[in-house]
Amino acid sequence: MDIRKTYVIIFFVGILTISFSSYNIGQTRLVVIQEQEPHCIGPCEIAFGNRPCNEECTSQQYAYGFCDYQTKGEDNPQCCCYTS
């Protein structure tokens, strides 16, 4: 009797797992992230980090900003602002 009970429990757990995974797949919405070009407003002060850059960007009505080390290289990071 114990083996039959174990198999029934495993069966119901399997059915429950499949039903939840099918539910999630059916309800998933695809979110398209658009690649946006940053608006770089000037060089970053390496000693201060991202905080002054973010504050400057938010004061200019951007959502956020940070020091971008890829725009002009590691030696000359730029403060780049983003809208979203």
Swiss-Prot record:
InterPro entries: Defensin-like_dom. Keywords: Antimicrobial, Disulfide bond, Fungicide, Plant defense, Secreted, Signal. It is found in: Secreted. Pfam families: Defensin. GO terms for biological process: defense response to fungus; killing of cells of another organism. Belongs to the DEFL family. This is Putative defensin-like protein 63.
